[in-house]
Amino acid sequence: MSRTESTPTLLDPQLSDEKWLGKLDWRKGAPASLVGASRKGNIDGFAAALKEQNSLSAKRQLKLTELLQGLHLNDSHNGILVRTFLGLTSSTADDLESELTQALELHGLNPAPPLEVIAGLTFLLVAPNRLSQATHVSLWRWCVVQCCHWIEEQPTEGEPETLSDLLSVAELPLLAGQMFPHLKQSKKWISKGRKGWNQWCTETTDSDGTLDAQWLDRMLPVLQSLGRSETYLQDASESLLSAKLTGSMEGLVKRCLCLATPGRLATLSSASSGTLTEFKSALAALGYKKTHPIRRLLALYADPQSRGQRLGVRTWDLPEQFHQSDWAEWACLRTSWDADLDQVLVNYGDAQTVLDIVLNGLSVFSGSWTSQLQLDGVPWEPSEWSCSCVFHDDDADYVELQQVDDDKGVTITRQILLNRANRGLFLADIIKTNQPGELSYRWELPFSSDVIPNAGSQNGHPHAAEPRFEFDALTREAAAQFEDLRVRLFPLGWPQDRFAPAPGKMQLDRQGLAMEVRVTGDGLCLPLFLDWHPPRRDTPCDWSLLTVAEDGQVIDRSQALGSRLRLGREQWLYFYNIRPGALPRTVLGHHTLYETVIARVKRGGEIVPLVQVDQEQVE
């Protein structure tokens, strides 16, 4: 019987289990006990033959159960079969029978989510002796029907777009091929599963292993699925991890390690991310030993007392900290792998940038960095972001993004600089238009759920203490106090004096941070400096807008903006040429043709650039 003839018959819900068994098509060499019981429609004999084929000892079944349980997210959205499997070791025989019967009645023979099918197959692998003969055969039939549906009848075409798509083309065929080796339909299932994994890695990772930003929120479930797939094959003395797939997987893990910080695993989305412990378990299943530097780092981060401590493993044993991929559309700016790290993750694959900002090991901001621009009162529709400039050295990590609308003559430039040497973060938005008019602009950045109580931390952290927001009475400085972390904010594009005129304002409340500005002209620059370095938490500060000159003529601030910030004995310069001139411009005694200069100012007045940017290059 051909595939096209036999598969629809197996999917017929009108057949009883006895008649259905008689319709099975077996490969040559299938065990006589299975074939004989099947052709006779003998439920008890078929169940007994199935158990004979499972060679796992009770001890091995228990060990495999515990291993596979650690490779599932403990998620409230799990289906009934996944939940039942996660509670398998503590359930009684009666409870298990009842829950499986309920699950099979709930799903029927309609297509079930691939993860539910995988859980059903796992019961057949690790718990056949705990099932009654009737339930064993019913579950076996249900799994065969589901596998035929997903693998043969409605296979996912093209690149998988969802986790369910990936499970149906990769893990499910691998496990199904192992569990049903004697069925004719399963002949190529294992090879299909191997091909599915290889194709997914090729299509969703950059050449260095950077994962497509659209998959970041599913990074851990993907690694768990890969770990389960490897576990199934290892139990059959095989391996999924070819040299090519191993290389892709190792690159992915290195690039995604930045998602791990003390006590949490980021996703750059609102999706549940899983835990550091689940991340460690996935790596263990993929061959990462307990002594591997990455697993040691995750163990450090999982310690509730680790945040703010400098207890990391050796830097040269870990991946490079900074990375950015135009193809994957995200970047990581990071100071170190220590537990007191500072980090900015940037996902710019859509019209709104997504940020995840960790300061001194604490997640402070997380979510969409939204922006709204109005031109003469008319809202401007944002375009997609692209990365126009990146820079990295021992002193600073820098990423520059742009939105360009040629039709409306609008360019928005977004700058992010993480000061690695002296700590501190520069954020700046610059708007340029072809025609002068009224520009109204506002951006918002939400706080992380880890620092706002009652927001519901996605990783199950205890609720944070209520933050305190401070606004200086005489200046425009503001601060947010999160338990032992104080973040100071300096709007460098406006005068320090609160009573001096300014074209905008800064807002700070439980919802997050926002800045808005309204000017008349064809450009504006909105820089902000954030400081949280503990030695500077109460240091006196001052900042001032600087005079910018070209060939002895003062340049209006709508054409170029310069600002100097002083915190104690440390000083920084921020300069941006909104409309570059024909000659070098002078700011704080520094002559430059560059569009952007962000620099440290030494005590003697010497300018030491952290980054210099023009439209063509970075130095």
Describe each model-derived feature in a short phrase.
Residues M1-A112, Q343-N347, Q352-S368, P379-W380, ...:
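Ser/Thr/Asn(+Pro)-rich, low-complexity disordered segments
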Residues I416, A514-R518:
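Beta-strand-rich interaction surfaces with strong enrichment in secreted/lumenal proteins
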Residues H533-E619:
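Non-catalytic terminal regions with compositionally biased, polar/charged low complexity
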Residues M1-L50, Y232, A236, L252-D342, ...:
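Terminal, non-catalytic domain-edge segments
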Residues R498-K505, L526-F529:
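Eukaryotic intrinsically disordered, low-complexity regulatory regions
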Residues R518-W532:
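Short Pro-Gly-centered flexible turn/kink motifs
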Residues Y288-E483, D522-L526, I555, V601-E619:
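Catalytic and substrate-binding regions of extracellular carbohydrate-active enzymes
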Residues D44-M249:
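Aromatic-lined, polymer-binding surfaces characteristic
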